[in-house]
Amino acid sequence: IGCGRGCGGRGYGGLGYGGLGYGGLGYGGLGGGCGRGFSGGGLPVATASAAPTGLGIASENRYEGTVGVCGNLPFLGTAAVAGEFPTVGIGEILYGCGNGAVGITREGGLGYGAGYGGGYGLGYGGYGGGYGLGYGGYGGCGCGCGY
């Protein structure tokens, strides 16, 4: 049955953030909180890469021959056919990339190395107001426990 009184009774799960308002009888008190009866199994997630945007051929005509692409491509290669094929004949995609040896031939300079790294420092959940003042507990220390 939920998390009971939470973090100290008056803060996160007691009378402040989770008392009689947001979490007393719901989020952290007697409701769905983090009780064992409400824990489900794993959440399956399926992801897919974004569609390539560098080369596109869309037509109702017939294309024969080769298409040459030179440069740095973000994907190893994709090909797709959309539309309807006639009831007679064949339709296919033949895709080739070099000699089959795939490797990274160029890497950028700094990438993600240099940049702002505030993370959890002084913002929403760090040492600042966070959940503490107003939304969570009476005084708060940033984590919502109240004091």
From Swiss-Prot:
**A Gene Ontology MF term for this entry?**
structural constituent of egg chorion
Source organism's superkingdom? Eukaryota
Stated name of the protein: Chorion class B protein B.L1
Any single biological process term in GO: chorion-containing eggshell formation
Where are the sequence-type repeats located? 11-15, 16-20, 21-25, 26-30
| Keyword match Repeat | yes
Repeat recorded as keyword: yes
* UniProt keyword annotations, A-Z: Repeat
Which Pfam families does its entry note? Answer: Chorion_1 (PF01723)
The UniProt similarity line reads:
Belongs to the chorion protein family.
Function summary: This protein is one of many from the eggshell of the silk moth.
Give all cystine bridges in this chain.
Answer: none
Tell me the segments the record calls region Central domain: 39-107
Q: Where is this region: 4 X 5 AA tandem repeats of G-Y-G-G-L?
A: 11-30
Name the InterPro entries on file: Chorion
Give the region (Left arm) as residue ranges.
1-38
The taxonomic lineage of its organism, from the top, reads:
Eukaryota, Metazoa, Ecdysozoa, Arthropoda, Hexapoda
Which cellular components does GO assign to this protein? egg chorion
> Which residues lie within the region annotated Right arm (Gly-rich tandem repeats)?
108-147
